[in-house]
Amino acid sequence: MTAFHSPRLFLSLSLLGLLAGCGGDPKPAPPAPVVVGPAPTAAAKPLRIGIALGGGAAKGFAHIGVIKMLQANGLEPVVVSGTSAGSVVGALYASGMDAFQMQQAAVALDETSIRDMRLFSGGLVQGQALQDYVNAQLKNRPIEKLGKPFAAVSTRLEDGERTVFVRGNAGQAVRASSSIPGVFEPVTIGKFHFVDGGVVSPVPVDAARQLGADFVVAVDISSKASGKNPAGMLGIVNQSIAIMGQRLGQQELARADIVIRPKVNDIGAADSAQRNAAILEGEKAALAAMPQIKAKLAQLQQQRAAAAKAAQPAAPPCEPRSRLGRLIGRDDPCKKQE
């Protein structure tokens, strides 16, 4: 007679005997249990880089150099806002042009073709030629049909309110954003009149945030008071606007993640002959800021990843093995999670 020296073996054989003695048709096996594990970790969404391009008349060619260096380093802005000259470059960039195409367009630009000089009650330049030029470059697409989200910032003349154009006629929005008071005729849109956005938002950081940018690179090309008389009427008006918007501008710039300041103070507001020099200064300034940009982006990405991980639901509590499970030697799932 064989003795059962192992209670575990005895119990297993007893269970087999009971199952074998059961008559009737075999019942279908129940479905396999579903194992619920911890939810997969959600990857942090890629950061949306925005660029806010400030006003500065002919100094605005520097924006092209900044964009060129960002693209060369794989940091493509996907959101664009612009004030005055920044709105011109911003619209071209948002339309799908890269920095090299914009530079070609800048070099080929005949300045007289966008200056419809006539004596109007509100300014020396009507601005229709600028509007037509921008729309031609954009193939007459409205703002909402451009390749990237774009905002042109202007000032409503009736009450001084900042106005952000994100839909409609792109050329008209750029014209409104660029209508330097006393030089350009105010632009009539609906029942309101609009002038240069630099009066209320010299570098439109907030507009870039409103478009969904997580990380904003601001480009400040505004004139700084040098103690000297600015040259020409346009220089005087441009510096006057910069002084008026200086305090507001500093507050808004503080909300940017990075501020790039190309050294373009020596370039006159109307000195379009130095467009290549301005582009080069933009490249230099962006290249100098690149280590800081990359470090801040990496830091923000780490913060986002940590926040996404912390937001994941905790794993469901394990169920300890039953008495029968212990008898037949089933592994304890709770010990595996320890």
Regions found by a protein language model. Name each.
Residues 82, 86:
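Gly/Ala-rich beta-loop-alpha elbow adjacent to hydrolase catalytic centers
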Residues 87-91:
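Long, contiguous secondary-structure blocks with strong helical propensity
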Residues 2-9, 13, 22-80, 92-338:
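Patatin-like phospholipase
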